[in-house]
Amino acid sequence: MVELTLSEQTWLKEYYPELSYDSSNHKLYGKVSFSLRYEDLPVNKGSYDFDVDFSLMKGRSDFPCVYNTDHRIIDAAKRKRKPLADFHIDSDGKLCMILPCKMPQFYTNGFNIQEFMTHLCNHLYWVSHYDLYDKEPWPGEKHGNEALIEYVKDYRNINLIVNDKKQLELFRVLFNKKYGKGIALNKLKNRLLTDESLFKELINWK
């Protein structure tokens, strides 16, 4: 699990006084209030109740489980008769905020509470705007497997992909199936970094 530092706890008390940190259970809970504006769109104000569970995080390269405990987001999806995925939330109230493989891209120095709260409030602004106006304020992330496929197919993410052993292993499986022979992970990593055509061949191979 991950424990919030004293400086993180102090920061939370100053900027998000409606949240409480339970150090024994490694949870943050309470109300998150925001007032935000994006470009020339209207200001959105709102508040949602949350539990943020840090207990399953193995380190700061992981992301906490974030649950909307007043069910406002699920209720909005039901009211609009839209899939929960459109509101980036699962049936148990857990928010879909980030693909695990994108953590190094958005949290370059690892998880910290200040960046997380900005991330969460931006997420809530998006959800609130979508609920109010039936339009995305900016293009939303894909959900679930669709998001993973979109991420992996984008060569701009190659440095993150090849430095993630699980993702690199998937490319080795594709390489073995396509060419009928094995390849060392380090060799495959170097080839993928220098040969975009190989990357595209493996991504598009069936």
Please state what every model-predicted region is.
Residues 6, 16-102, 110-115:
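Compact alpha/beta protein-protein interaction domains typified by the UBC
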Residues 4, 40, 133-136:
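Preference for intrinsically disordered or flexible, low-complexity segments
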Residues 1-12:
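Extreme N-terminal tail/first-helix region
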